[in-house]
């Protein structure tokens, strides 16, 4: 029985995961793209005042159980998805249901940080890690994350919340070596790296039939 292929695009903040994943989706017929940030907890949980910023981000940011039970586990077990799935709406800090249909033999791409944590890793058929140094990532987020505030406020947020949690992930999981493929996703090599990933996915799919 052919089962769905579940591809993870892992990487730290500002590494280019979303851009790469969108291009990859466009090149893969019928693949559906899910963003891990569509499955975050509301602010009251992910900004829990009883723990540090980095602890809240690392352990209280995402609804792993919901993602697993509603999407990853059924597909991994050879079942189709045909129903309403809750997606986070940042405008009202709540969830809205959307109809999702994925055939049992379909393909999905999940992009987000920390995808190789023990909660998720075994559900992926392959994980691509986008490895970009901190200086380049910081330059990107300073020019992108204006919703946080000024550049000083963005830097403060990353230094108190995101970077410490990312360092913990790197130490606990060594995602560069755990991943099936490691890419740089720089613009000059982006097309070539997308082609490389597509070939890798196709070869892996052929070998598991």
Annotate each predicted stretch with a short phrase:
Residues 45-91:
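Conserved nucleotide-sensing/catalytic segment adjacent to the nucleotide-binding pocket
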Residues 30-44:
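Short beta-strand-centered segment that lines the nucleotide-binding/catalytic pocket of NTP-utilizing
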Residues 1, 122, 143-147, 160, ...:
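NTP-dependent small-molecule kinase module
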Residues 1-7:
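Extreme N-terminal, non-catalytic leader segments
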Residues 17:
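Conserved lysine of the Walker
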